[in-house]
């Protein structure tokens, strides 16, 4: 069992989850960007792993790296910038690095190409160590995700699966809302809906998709030649090549012109390849033991997440639009054909000549119209209303006579009034008064009038006060009458 697991572990390739790959790729890029390539580490785990693998397998030989051959003169012309360090560190570094050029003086040690190459190789090893650690973290996280998916599949957890799908769809919706452009909103909504439909809702997929999912992703190892893939595979996995540089950018001793291409010195790429293989074997062994102990037969029935097959997005509005566009195009084509036909002048044909003359049928002649007297309904009604009209005319005549008579009498009355006024307006002399008998007016025998208060409507609550005042007023009036009589 252990031997089979080890064999499988050696040929094991990293299988990534397509859904969680984007976030993991971001983590890899973050680790690779933040790592310091100028930091020198003298003892690396890559060297240890390569030595251990070489000791175990004496027949094992490192794969020759396909290096880009460049002349040594170019390397000599390059200027390697070395940062100034403390004197103690410089001594330690010079002691640790062996110079092959024979320049052992301090002045020549700084300008030596061998030392510069070794420092670059050490920084490169550390850079790929950090990257390998990030890749291992991604593999562990993908395994955890797969275990979680298995628990979701084998347990009665349909609700959790639905909640996961809802969260993913909400994230896609938020991204679509944040990235709504000013123009082309309908197209943007269609694309967002297509993204939503891309999530796997059913477990039924085609066999071709299952085969594509089960195929392991071909990770490009550093220093290895890229295998030839078909166009479809290159379209699907173009992102895998972005993690590692091309073979032209690899810094090795043969590239720098220090050693021959088939030399025995192994580069950092060989160490990284051997360490990756050894780590992969350990991880595969550990995973196989854990699966056989804890999970049992669950690994055999494991199902990977199936990618939904994309189908074209169809709308009834688009179908209607196409139909209308076709009809409109047909109408325009017919109109253009009709206009073209109308532009062509049609010649008038000559009359058909015959030996015998044609006897054309004469049209039917209409008879002479006989005029008929008009019978108007208004004339008939006028005969019936003759008596009424006569009575109306008599009344109108009487009214006119009455008006004329009244006007005549009014004129006579006005004339008489004018005559009377003329007579009265004639001035007459007034008689002279008699001064010997002056007029002396006599005293009247009537009693003077006694004034009385008016009787107003007095309310009940004011009667007492009013009565008291009225009694005094009565007595006063009575006394005034008595005094007046005495004076007379």
From Swiss-Prot:
This one is known as: Microtubule-destabilizing protein 60
Summary of the function given for this chain in its UniProt record? Binds directly to microtubules. Microtubule-destabilizing protein involved in the PIF3-dependent positive regulation of hypocotyl cell elongation via the modulation of cortical microtubules dynamic in response to light and ethylene signaling. Promotes submergence-induced and ethylene-dependent underwater hypocotyl elongation.
> Which residue ranges have biased composition labelled Polar residues?
25-56
Q: Which organism is it from?
A: Arabidopsis thaliana (Mouse-ear cress)
Q: Where is the composition biased (Low complexity)?
A: 264-280
Q: Which family does it belong to?
A: Belongs to the TPX2 family.
List the GO cellular component terms: cytoplasm; microtubule; spindle
State one Pfam family annotation. Answer: TPX2
Q: Where is this region: Disordered?
A: 25-71, 262-304, 436-457
Write out the entry's keywords from A to Z: Cytoplasm, Cytoskeleton, Developmental protein, Microtubule
Q: Where does it localize?
A: Cytoplasm, Cytoskeleton
Q: What induces it?
A: Induced by ethylene (ACC) via PIF3 binding to its promoter and subsequent transcription regulation. Accumulates upon submergence through ethylene signaling. Repressed by aminoethoxyvinyl-Gly (AVG), an inhibitor of ethylene biosynthesis. Higher levels in light-grown hypocotyls.
């Amino acid at each position: 069992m252990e031997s089979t697991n080890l064999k499988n572990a050696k040929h094991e390739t990293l299988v990534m989850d397509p859904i969680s790959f984007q976030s993991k790729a971001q983590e890899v890029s973050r680790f690779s960007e933040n790592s310091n390539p100028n930091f020198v580490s003298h003892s690396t785990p890559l060297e240890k792993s390569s030595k251990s693998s070489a000791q175990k397998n004496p027949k094992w030989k490192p794969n020759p790296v396909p290096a880009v051959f460049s002349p040594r003169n170019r390397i000599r012309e390059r200027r390697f910038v070395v940062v100034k360090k403390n004197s103690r560190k410089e001594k330690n570094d010079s002691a640790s690095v062996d110079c092959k050029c024979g320049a052992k003086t301090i002045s020549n040690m700084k300008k030596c190409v061998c030392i510069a190459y070794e420092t670059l190789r050490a920084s490169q090893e550390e850079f790929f160590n950090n990257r390998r650690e990030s890749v291992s973290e991604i593999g562990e996280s993908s395994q955890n995700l797969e275990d979680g998916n298995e628990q979701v599949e084998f347990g009665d957890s349909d609700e959790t699966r639905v909640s996961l799908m809802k969260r993913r769809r909400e994230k896609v919706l938020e991204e679509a809302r944040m990235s709504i452009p000013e123009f082309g909103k309908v197209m943007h909504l269609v694309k967002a809906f297509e993204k939503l439909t891309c999530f796997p809702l059913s477990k039924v997929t085609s066999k071709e998709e299952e085969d594509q999912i089960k195929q392991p992703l071909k990770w490009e190892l550093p220093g290895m030649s890229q295998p030839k893939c078909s166009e479809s595979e290159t379209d699907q996995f173009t992102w895998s090549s972005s993690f590692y540089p091309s073979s032209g950018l690899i810094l090795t001793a043969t590239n720098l012109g220090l050693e021959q291409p088939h030399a025995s010195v192994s580069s950092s790429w060989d160490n990284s390849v051997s360490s990756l293989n050894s780590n992969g074997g350990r991880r595969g062994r550990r995973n196989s033991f854990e699966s056989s102990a804890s999970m049992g037969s669950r690994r055999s029935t494991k199902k990977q997440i199936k990618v939904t097959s994309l189908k074209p997005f169809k709308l009834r509005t688009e179908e209607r639009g196409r139909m209308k566009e076709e009809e409109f195009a047909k109408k325009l084509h017919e109109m253009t054909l009709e206009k073209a036909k109308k532009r062509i002048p049609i010649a008038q044909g000559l009359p058909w000549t015959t030996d015998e003359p044609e006897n054309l049928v004469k049209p039917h002649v209409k008879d002479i119209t006989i005029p008929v007297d008009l019978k108007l309904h208004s004339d008939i009604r006028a005969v019936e209303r003759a008596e009424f009209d006569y009575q109306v005319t008599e009344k109108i005549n009487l009214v006119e006579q009455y008006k004329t008579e009244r006007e005549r009498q009014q004129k006579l009355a006005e004339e008489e009034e004018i005559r009377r006024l003329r007579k009265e307006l004639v001035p007459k002399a007034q008689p002279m008064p008699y001064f010997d008998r002056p007029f002396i007016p006599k005293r009247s025998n009537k009693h003077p009038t006694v004034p009385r208060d008016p009787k107003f409507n007095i309310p009940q609550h004011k009667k007492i006060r009013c009565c008291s005042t009225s009694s005094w007023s009565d007595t006063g009036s009575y006394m005034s009458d008595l005094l007046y009589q005495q004076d007379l």
